[in-house]
């Protein structure tokens, strides 16, 4: 028996079946770095229209986590897809490098500034620490396959950036948005200093817990609100607090707009409480006989006035989201000078930020006769006695609770309003202009707009000053007596910025005021405050985007971060850009959700459900992580677990196998010589290229809309359904058995070539490593990297006017599906082994019959059977299977007649008819020794 294997065109490629991504990707990365792939892309895209995605800087502290990976991968997918869409899309990664977390790390290792080190040495250590953190994170980001200018990132601690941050503040001052005010901060009376959040520890402390009645000014108005008239005694709103010493600074009572508040009659008076807390309050104050007279929503009580029990003035009821039903009365004593929530709501309602307490923790003169000069922690008993005397105390008891203490002295601390610098939301119309700018931005998802609008509408002035060591100095001089800014402030800030550009922020602390103020130096002092780190990152549209040469003066098109950044970077950037330039710093803002585990739980080390991106890359490879990110709808929470990543790996295999099939069957194909013109191609091959064209239209639309999960779904449908279960199945016979250089085979290879050229580009933004690998195995002359080109433009399809158009092949797909069902049943019944052992008769209504007949003998190749005939629908025997999908079709199956050809495996009547090739069929003889078979349709 002759061996005809050598006469077959068997698939062959060096492209491996297994991805082995974890092992292969580092080698590819090394090549990308050695070749300067990012630089190659920039050179290729020079002069094209720009798309600038400005990187929100992660904080330079700690290893990257799965959330960082999601963020950087989404950005990379956009940048690469924009490049393929014909844009020059430079990507400059950045890092946020100043601020408290870095200070704390350095303090833990070296001690506080001024202890073992000077402040200057401390800043140098902070700079050093931040640089090592940047290096660690950069390696992991590069490993993800993210392309960017990693050799020249922007750091907020770059001298030039620090200088430009100072210039940004100067511009805001010049536009009239800065003012000085007071804001409550953690204050240690022993240190006589403000404390950062991280310098606060919590210990148990015993304090008096009191319920206090504030009597209504207009009793009749309250009766009307509750629609009651028969009230016995005065009406009061009851607050509960564990800090009686703050009552002299009370300026309002906060209630919740949506809670139900009850008017409760007790002995000789009526009190207002949250309805859900009535029972617990009555138990606490020892009242058993009470009646609820009526209820209203908290919003109904807004701005009604109540009398302070001992300070001699009225205070309003105001609405606040910070009010809870966890404890107390549902009405919160509000002292804007002694608490952050109180301060924020106080700003909203224009309340006085009263601060009757000095830096040593004693009441200032003129506070109240029995309190002046008394330490606040010794004043609680005095205040309780005062309330009792005034008849306003409903209840007092001792209560143990967790209380903030100084980490150095272990003593209780207070909130105390201190002078700070603010960007005003309203003095020059910043709020109104920002709200206007928001409307001109595209928010993705669109609910982001309402979210940030509400935040801007309700936010207080922005406190931008900090009393820290490692930060950009405010670089201001104020008059010793008047505390007014120097009249030449903008000029002086520019002088400071020039020095910082050369020597970094230390230049400010080294500066002797005389150097730039001359004789005026004696009248002015340097402001010691640094800027809030959100000012650093929020001004990068100016300090980075406006000055980097690759951005060529273009503003950012997109900001992309997690949904928590509406109140973070998106907000600070909007405030600063609008205050500086009168416009938003971005055209589009895209937000993604947070990562959760497979059960939807938040990632937590204590639960043990975190997924480490480093582990995923080391086990599965970065492309699997990238595919998971792309295939997840980022607009909501993004679930990740080993099981979910395994599913991503399964999808990856399907795509890789499709790519491998294409490459293996392009063996020996030279597009320059072997390409078949579209009009000479087999119709089914043109249909397949048309499928790729339709898929490309959908995929490009999805990339344009940033719907990456739609890209993945469409890619999977193309690989699995349109190619895998139909076209690639059908062409194997022609591809393997036809004459190597025949039109029948070259037509097929032409289609595979066009499909591969398109597919590799669709993959590139998401499966970057695999696309690069595929690119290296594609035949024909090409650029070195897929990332420098654009979407493939060589696709074409069938015209609707053709008889065998897309609709024709759609119907054929259905027919084949029905035939497959019959074959599967016959296999289950052991009537046939495989589909080539079968011959089918299709009993069809005239319209369908005409289509099937048009394929002639090639119908059997579409159906993957050894025989296929078409007959009249009404001649179908009783055992013919009625199609459920096509009403005018019945299918009958019989065992194929003739012998099995060992070369093509078809059963035919003409095996052995040619003496020289006695073992194979006539078609194979023609393909081996003759002119080769001709195919027109399939």
UniProtKB/Swiss-Prot annotation:
Cofactor note: Binds 1 zinc ion per subunit.
Motif ('KMSKS' region): 602-606
Chain segments annotated as transmembrane: none
One GO cellular component term: cytosol
Residues reported in the UniProt entry to bind ATP: 605
GO molecular function, one term: zinc ion binding
Enzymatic reactions: tRNA(Ile) + L-isoleucine + ATP = L-isoleucyl-tRNA(Ile) + AMP + diphosphate
Alphabetic keyword roster: Acetylation, Aminoacyl-tRNA synthetase, ATP-binding, Cytoplasm, Ligase, Metal-binding, Nucleotide-binding, Protein biosynthesis, Zinc
Domain observations: IleRS has two distinct active sites: one for aminoacylation and one for editing. The misactivated valine is translocated from the active site to the editing site, which sterically excludes the correctly activated isoleucine. The single editing site contains two valyl binding pockets, one specific for each substrate (Val-AMP or Val-tRNA(Ile)).
Residue numbers carrying N6-acetyllysine: 183
Required cofactor(s): Zn(2+)
Subcellular locations according to the entry: Cytoplasm
HAMAP family: Ile_tRNA_synth_type1
Role: Catalyzes the attachment of isoleucine to tRNA(Ile). As IleRS can inadvertently accommodate and process structurally similar amino acids such as valine, to avoid such errors it has two additional distinct tRNA(Ile)-dependent editing activities. One activity is designated as 'pretransfer' editing and involves the hydrolysis of activated Val-AMP. The other activity is designated 'posttransfer' editing and involves deacylation of mischarged Val-tRNA(Ile).
Listed name of the protein: Isoleucine--tRNA ligase
First and last residue of the signal peptide: none
Positions annotated to bind L-isoleucyl-5'-AMP: 561
GO annotation, biological process: isoleucyl-tRNA aminoacylation
Cross-referenced PANTHER family: ISOLEUCINE--TRNA LIGASE, MITOCHONDRIAL, SOLEUCYL-TRNA SYNTHETASE
EC number: 6.1.1.5
Main localisation: cytoplasm
NCBIfam families assigned to the protein according to its UniProt record, in alphabetical order: ileS
Subunit architecture: Monomer.
Binding-site positions, Zn(2+): 901, 904, 921, 924
């Amino acid at each position: 028996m002759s061996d005809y294997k050598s006469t077959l065109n068997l698939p062959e490629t060096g492209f491996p079946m297994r991805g082995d991504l974890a092992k292969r990707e580092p080698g590819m990365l090394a090549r990308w770095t050695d070749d300067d792939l990012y630089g190659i892309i920039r050179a290729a895209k020079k002069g094209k229209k720009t798309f600038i995605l400005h990187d929100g800087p992660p904080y330079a502290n700690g290893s990257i986590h799965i959330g960082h990976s999601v963020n950087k991968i989404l950005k990379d997918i956009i940048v690469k897809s924009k490049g393929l869409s014909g844009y020059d899309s430079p990507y400059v990664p950045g890092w946020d490098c100043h601020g408290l977390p870095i200070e704390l790390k350095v303090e833990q290792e070296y001690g506080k500034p001024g202890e073992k080190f000077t402040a200057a040495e401390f800043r140098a250590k902070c700079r050093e620490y931040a640089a090592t953190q940047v290096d660690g994170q950069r390696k992991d980001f590069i490993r993800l396959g993210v392309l960017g200018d990693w050799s020249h990132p922007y750091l907020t601690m770059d001298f030039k950036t620090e200088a430009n941050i100072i210039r940004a503040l100067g511009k805001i001052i010049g536009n009239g948005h800065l003012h000085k005010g007071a804001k409550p901060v953690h204050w240690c009376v022993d240190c006589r200093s403000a404390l950062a959040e991280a310098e606060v520890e919590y210990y148990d402390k015993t304090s008096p817990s009191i319920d206090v009645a504030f009597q209504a000014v207009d009793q009749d108005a309250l009766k009307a609100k509750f629609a009651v008239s028969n009230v016995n005694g005065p009406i009061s709103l009851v607050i509960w607090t564990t800090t009686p010493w703050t009552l002299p600074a009370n300026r309002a009572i906060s209630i919740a707009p949506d809670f139900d508040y009850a008017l409760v009659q007790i002995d000789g008076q009526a009190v207002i409480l949250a309805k859900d807390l009535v029972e617990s309050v009555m138990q606490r104050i020892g009242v058993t006989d009470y009646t609820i007279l009526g209820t209203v929503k908290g919003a109904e009580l807004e701005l009604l006035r109540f009398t302070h029990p001992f300070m001699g003035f009225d205070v309003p009821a105001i609405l606040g989201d910070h009010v809870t039903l966890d404890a107390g009365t549902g009405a919160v004593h509000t002292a804007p000078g002694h608490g952050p929530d109180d301060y924020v709501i106080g700003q909203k309602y224009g309340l006085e930020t009263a601060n009757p307490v000095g830096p040593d923790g004693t009441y200032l003169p003129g506070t109240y006769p029995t309190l002046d000069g008394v330490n606040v922690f010794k004043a609680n008993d005095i205040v309780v006695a005062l309330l009792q005397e005034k008849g306003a105390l409903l209840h007092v008891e001792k209560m143990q609770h967790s209380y903030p203490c100084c980490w150095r002295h272990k003593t209780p601390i207070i909130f105390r309003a201190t002078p700070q610098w603010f960007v005003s939301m309203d003095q020059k119309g910043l709020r109104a202009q920002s709200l206007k700018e928001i409307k001109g931005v595209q928010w993705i998802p669109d609910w982001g707009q309402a979210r940030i609008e509400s935040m801007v509408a309700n936010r207080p002035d922005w406190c931008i000053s900090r009393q820290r060591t490692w930060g950009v100095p405010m670089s201001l001089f104020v008059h010793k007596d008047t505390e007014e800014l120097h009249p030449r402030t903008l000029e002086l800030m520019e002088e400071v910025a020039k020095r910082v550009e050369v020597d970094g922020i230390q230049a400010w602390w080294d500066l002797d005021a005389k150097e730039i103020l001359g004789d005026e130096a004696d009248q002015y002092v340097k402001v010691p405050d640094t800027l809030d780190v959100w000012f650093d990152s929020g001004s990068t549209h100016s300090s980075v985007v406006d000055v980097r040469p690759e951005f060529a003066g273009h503003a950012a098109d997109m900001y992309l971060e997690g949904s928590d950044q509406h109140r973070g970077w998106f907000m600070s950037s909007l405030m600063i850009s609008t205050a500086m330039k009168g416009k938003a710093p971005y055209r589009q803002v895209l937000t993604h959700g947070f990562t959760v585990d497979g059960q939807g739980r938040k990632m937590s080390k204590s639960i043990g459900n975190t997924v480490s991106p480093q582990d995923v890359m080391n086990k599965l490879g970065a492309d699997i992580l990238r595919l998971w990110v792309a295939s997840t709808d980022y607009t909501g929470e993004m679930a990740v677990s080993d099981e979910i990543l395994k599913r991503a790996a399964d999808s990856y295999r399907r795509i890789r196998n499709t790519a491998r099939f294409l490459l293996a069957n392009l063996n020996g194909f030279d597009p320059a010589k072997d390409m078949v013109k579209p009009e000479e191609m087999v119709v089914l091959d043109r249909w397949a290229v048309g499928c790729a064209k339709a898929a490309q239209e959908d995929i490009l639309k999805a990339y344009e809309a940033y719907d990456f999960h739609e890209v993945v779904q469409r890619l999977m449908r193309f690989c699995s359904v349109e190619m895998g279960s139909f076209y690639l199945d059908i062409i194997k016979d022609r591809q393997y058995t036809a004459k190597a250089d025949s039109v029948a085979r070259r037509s097929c290879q032409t289609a595979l070539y066009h499909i591969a050229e398109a597919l590799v580009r669709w993959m590139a933004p998401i499966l970057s490593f695999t696309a690069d690998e595929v690119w290296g195995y594609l035949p024909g002359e090409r650029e070195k990297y897929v990332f420098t080109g654009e979407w493939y433009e060589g696709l074409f399809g069938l015209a609707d006017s053709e008889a065998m158009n897309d609709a024709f092949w759609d119907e054929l797909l259905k027919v084949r599906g029905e035939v497959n069902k019959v074959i599967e049943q016959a296999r289950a019944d052991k009537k046939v082994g495989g589909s080539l052992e079968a011959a089918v008769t299709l009993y069809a209504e005239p319209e369908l019959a005409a289509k099937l007949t048009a394929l002639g003998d090639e119908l059997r190749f579409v159906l993957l059977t050894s025989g296929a005939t078409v007959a009249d629908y009404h001649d179908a025997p009783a055992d013919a299977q009625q199609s459920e999908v096509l009403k005018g079709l019945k299918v009958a199956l019989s065992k194929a007649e003739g012998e099995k050809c060992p070369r093509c495996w078809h059963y035919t009547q003409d095996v052995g008819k040619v003496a020289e090739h006695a073992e194979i069929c006539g078609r194979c003889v023609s393909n081996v020794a003759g002119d080769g078979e001709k195919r027109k349709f399939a």
